[in-house]
Amino acid sequence: MATWGAQHRRFENLMRYRIRDILLVSSPYDYFTLEEDGRLNELLLVDYQQLNLSYAPRITHAATGERALDLLKERPFDLVITMARVGEMAVHVFGRRAKEIQSGIPVVLLAYNTRELALFHEGDAIDRIFVWSGDARVLLAIIKLVEDLRNVDHDTRAGEAQVLILVEDSPRFYSLFLPQLYSELMKQTGSLMAGGLSLHHKLLRMRARAKILLATDMEQAQELYSRYAPFLLGVISDAGFPSEGSHDPQAGKKFVAQVQRESPDAALMMQSSLPENRKVAAKLGVEFIDKADQSLLKGLRSFMRANLGFGDFVFRLPDGEEVGRAQDIAGMRKLLPTCRASRCAT
């Protein structure tokens, strides 16, 4: 078992890429709407503090695409989030020019409604499309998704960080689901350490949390799985999504079945707004949640606690009898002497 000193050095080496400066591009009206519930910088800071994250990025606003391009020429940014209306410039033209000024900078489009979604698509100019629903936590999800994608290669190999793959092609749904998924992942990661470590050590260990990677079609899902199968913690997949250029209602079943065969220890869950897909999941023997269910978050939380290693530490005798249960590391340490004497196992 690695010593704390070795683990400390390993954790410090993770999450090398961090988003510190964000350029937000929107019309004054759109910016006013975004800040209707409070200043974005302050809301983001509160979200980071509540989740025990060590820093919050700074947001700089530009009212037009031209002004944003000038700012990109003046100083570096880590991420561009743009609304659809950026002055006289088309948003795809803006995204392309932004990447010409700062090579490799991620550009995320934040749309307002379904009509806007129909007008835009991901490509060379736009890396990802999200939908604003009034919940500022979508900004945290965007930030963490970009960071995870940039850090996953290094962190899986240097620190053995695990990977959770989300397969979902609806920007509207993943814009609602990802903030919940990230919040729950961070809360449950933190709960395992409650009372057992100093704040500094907790912040370090948060760097080693599972990376969330988003795929919006079968080709992306297969690529992510092929690359990170040795580090796979689990898969949450929609029942139907695009495959080979067209919608395949059986794509989720096919992908989950493949992962089930090749990575039998991975936690698997299907989600769908079609009730009949519950039977598909049951036949595969995997968890299922209804995307239209008001208790979706409760189902997600139960899945994570039961299947992703976030439940209690349970100590049992060789015959299966439970002799102890701990909710965090501190509780586990108290039980260890008794369990050693009883020769129990987790």
Please report, for each region that a protein language model flagged, where it lies by residue.
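Conserved phosphotransfer microenvironments
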Residues: 3-4, 33-41, 45, 54-56, ...
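Short beta-strand/turn micro-motifs composed of small residues
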Residues: 24-26, 110-113, 168, 270-272
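As written
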Residues: 91, 119-129, 280-289
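Polyanion-binding and phosphate-handling cores
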Residues: 230, 246, 253-267, 273-314
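Non-catalytic signal-transmission and effector/linker regions of two-component phosphorelay proteins
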Residues: 1-60, 87, 96, 119-128, ...
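Generic beta-sheet signal
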Residues: 108-110, 132, 271, 291
